[in-house]
Amino acid sequence: MSNNIKKKLKTIYRKIIINLFYLIYTKPTNKIRKKDDSEKIYNLTIDKNQYRIFEFINGRIYTDSNDTTAYISENNYVSDASLQYKKFDSINSRNQKTLDNEVLKIGTPKFKRKVNGSILSLISGGASRDNFTHWFTDVIPRIKIYQQKFNLKMITKFYLPSIKHKFQLESLSYLGIKKKDIITSEKYKHIEAKKIFATTHPCYHKPSKVKSWSLMYLKKIYIKKNTQKKYQKIFIDRDQFRLLDLNDLEK
């Protein structure tokens, strides 16, 4: 079977799945200035930076674990809390307008998992699944934003991009978050809960402009509790970085 035929069959299969899920879950719509009483928005300031906390009553989250995350209210509107990244080169992406969110085109073609209780979503795009820096600049600081208004004890489950790396679970443990309290988007891409909380991005989707409050927050949590051996120099291996004598360095 040729690659073209395989590609066409894959496209047909995807369209069938999308249309079947239209029958199960109504396709979300864009709010466009309509009032939505199932979504509350709290405005706050951290070190002169403006942020928002979004609270959804009986809301949903749909994500592809990469470029698209849609926060959907009980009234089936896509919230401004949503993420819709689009690449502008081979590596980097920009967050687009809510109107560009993929669920407005394809709906939510995954079975939904219901969670009894409250969820704090820390979803921050595909890079935060594996990238050490994105984890600490995009994911963890969202907890600080949430804590400006609410107590973490209110949260039943934390919705995270991944916990497959050791540093992810370790970093969460410093905040009292245990593995049993976590749901990952790798396993569940469509969830619903009695309450869902989300926040705006800690550095406004600009990883090169991490806010000073965010760095101080990380320092307060992790540095004072670090009992590891001190080193003169630390080498961080980045996935997009190539070093010719890396094997010798690791030895």
Region locations from a protein language model:
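The feature primarily captures lumenal catalytic ectodomains
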Residues: S2-K251
